[in-house]
């Protein structure tokens, strides 16, 4: 019943002294080779992080999301996005992706979300609130998860997150679409790095 994780980031993403703007991009050739080797029926899902924690929160380009999800769709594999660190990723897309510099953060978020079958996140990291959520596109998948909710969260009809927490999360999501707010973290880190270099 076991399984294993395959890390399929591009080799260039592991080079620390590099100007590559999206070091978190998935290597599509590695993804295809992995599916070929394991067999699509043996791949439960393809999971991407928006802001790749494994390599220091490096951002993923919208094109990489699109390409990876297209491969997953082609092979009938569920595509899953961990959007917990999406705010920083959105910031870097907005400033580094020429095609999306004039798009709103909200429109970029929609473009990313449209690619995936499932999105989950910790609201503490994305949304500035306690709690989290799992979003699914397929109603059958949604219903298949209902039996698991009482074991981890609360009953479907009550319990779980309070209205206050849901309200705080809603405000946090709205703030996460504001470039001034999502730029704080990356700009603070850049400031600290620049001071250390000086």
What label would you give each PLM region?
Residues 1-198:
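Conserved PLP-enzyme active-site core in the AAT-like
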């Amino acid at each position: 019943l076991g399984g294993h994780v395959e890390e399929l980031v591009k080799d260039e993403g592991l080079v620390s002294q590099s100007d590559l703007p999206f070091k978190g991009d998935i290597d599509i050739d590695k993804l295809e080779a992995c599916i070929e080797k394991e067999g699509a029926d043996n791949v439960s899902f393809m999971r991407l992080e928006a802001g790749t924690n494994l390599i220091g929160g490096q951002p993923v380009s919208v094109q990489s999301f699109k390409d990876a999800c297209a491969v997953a769709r082609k092979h009938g594999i569920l595509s899953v996005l961990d959007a917990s660190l999406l705010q920083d990723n959105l910031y870097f897309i907005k400033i580094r992706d020429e095609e999306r510099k004039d798009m709103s953060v909200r429109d970029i978020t929609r473009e990313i979300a449209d690619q995936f079958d499932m999105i989950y996140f910790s609201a503490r990291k994305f949304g500035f609130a306690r709690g989290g959520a799992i979003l699914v596109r397929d109603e059958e998948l949604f219903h298949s998860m209902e039996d698991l909710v009482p074991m981890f969260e609360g009953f479907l009809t009550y319990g779980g997150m309070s209205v206050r927490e849901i309200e705080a999360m809603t405000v946090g999501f709205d703030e996460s679409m504001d470039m001034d707010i999502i730029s704080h973290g990356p700009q603070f880190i850049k400031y600290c790095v620049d001071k250390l270099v000086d």
